[in-house]
């Protein structure tokens, strides 16, 4: 057995190394095991008043009450724990055990930043986040500056020399952006396979094309249609832009989940967003402004929602506000870009069912842009309605925002339902009131028309005997159209049954009231599509398995004649100018100029003759394309014109001269197309002749090699035999042209 000296090689004292002197932090971090601590339902509230133990019970009860009133969350006093310092005073924060992790997430959303009193404001976090915050480096690291990359011009498509519109077509896995040509097929500008995983959508002004992906939303724009921005909302299925394209709202059926290693930044979700389904984004920067939960059904089953309708947020026309409905309780108005509640509280309205913002007309926009000090622009307005409750009648109310001033209200009786229809220029408001008789056995309809540009908003009532199934204002005019029906099968349609309807046109009479203009009976139409410029309207039958009718009407057909004859019948102005049919039609859309109509049959609805057709404003079919797996076609919207009133008047005045120029260009284009077709035919014919001559030479060479006679001699011999075997039969036909009788003496 060796001695100690031999083992230590003569060293008097063993030189052992202490484990405490070795840094194992990198190894521990690499091989650390994450345990499921089950503390997701525990939150930490900072900013709590410093107290002694004698005041603990009172503080807990106050916090319990605040959670109930502000966040509608029940917490138990027994679930609160507060640490104390050595001097007997609390440390300014408490731990709260919530009933579930979902309640903890809601508490973070609702109570973080809550002002407990003038000196204390809550800061709420998950207990599991404390360790993560503690491990953050205290050394500031300068973020890397991204290299500036200039953007392409986002409205370049408006500079097309021919003034053509664009459209996007989805077919199978391919997405195409194409120019619309009147006399030829769409000219493809951009085409990409698998550009989107579901469908596409244009922004309201046509600046961006939206595509949907599993990881989130992407928007594209510019001459090369490059990606402009990403919005990382996993599973997003619905998108809604604000009118000026400054903001965007997305919805996903999947609750937001934030993993522990999730990136941090203004464009990413944080712990306070967990469990939410709605997200609001700033389009230009991609920053997340706020997220909202969507109330689930009491059953708690996924996908079963109550009180949810799309769009979830409705935008004011100037993008300053957005609002959402809390059914039966209130309307919550939020200011942009902070997305904070207007005046920090919702507008309490008992029983509220629906609301709509008043659009901003051209007059209002011009006034707002001029910003004259002596003329104040019209405030934003919303209209909402409340149903009948006990002895309280139903009510329609117009309110100014942000002042919350009631501008007009009207009581309604025997109301079953209301639909709110603003005129696109904000001149009128039509409330379509579905009413029942006292016995509730039959239904009829009233139109309550508010004149919102007149003092005190006078109301005109238009009474109708039948139920109204569709209503639409003329965009730039004083007409409106509606579809009514007294068919007993209305409301309970069965497969294969077509509902009989009436088409009604109304106009503003010179005496100042709305009167019937013309009625068309025995129709099957169920939808109305006004031209964006007004005057023309398409009436269609959609959703039927038997009828696919399309009808084009002009509501100002006799305008020039009537100008010289004021006594002419106004009903003569409404004229059916075109009819058509698109088998299996599922969608219809006007182009932004009001010159063309696109109808389509999508594979999303059925698989019979999928494709699209292009019509002019008079109902003449210009193109029709049957395409397998066709999904969608959308016109690219255009922004509001940059021409002022005077410039627009000058254009209208010289319209005849411009029309001649356009007609010449159209004729030249058609001539070029015809010439191109002739050249193509001639080229194909020459190619065929060359192939025939080459094949004849090859055949003659082959026959010569085989010792047979030439092709020409063989053909002549065959002709001779055919002539000998042919029997010519002649048949004489006599026809009596005239017959006369003479009597001979």
Curated annotation (Swiss-Prot):
Query: Could you tell me what this protein does?
Result: RNA-binding component of the eukaryotic translation initiation factor 3 (eIF-3) complex, which is involved in protein synthesis of a specialized repertoire of mRNAs and, together with other initiation factors, stimulates binding of mRNA and methionyl-tRNAi to the 40S ribosome. The eIF-3 complex specifically targets and initiates translation of a subset of mRNAs involved in cell proliferation.
Q: SUPFAM superfamilies attached here? A: DPP6 N-terminal domain-like, RNA-binding domain, RBD
Under Gene Ontology molecular function, one entry of this record is: RNA binding
Assembly and partners?
Component of the eukaryotic translation initiation factor 3 (eIF-3) complex.
Q: Give me the WD repeat coordinates as residue ranges.
A: 189-230, 251-293, 303-344, 580-625
Q: Which GO terms describe its cellular component?
A: cytoplasmic stress granule; eukaryotic 43S preinitiation complex; eukaryotic 48S preinitiation complex; eukaryotic translation initiation factor 3 complex; eukaryotic translation initiation factor 3 complex, eIF3e; eukaryotic translation initiation factor 3 complex, eIF3m; multi-eIF complex
What UniProt keywords apply to this chain's record, in alphabetical order? Answer: Coiled coil, Cytoplasm, Initiation factor, Protein biosynthesis, Repeat, RNA-binding, WD repeat
Coiled-coil region list: 644-745
Q: Where is the RRM domain?
A: 41-129
Where in or outside the cell it occurs: the entry states: Cytoplasm
Q: What is this protein called?
A: Eukaryotic translation initiation factor 3 subunit B
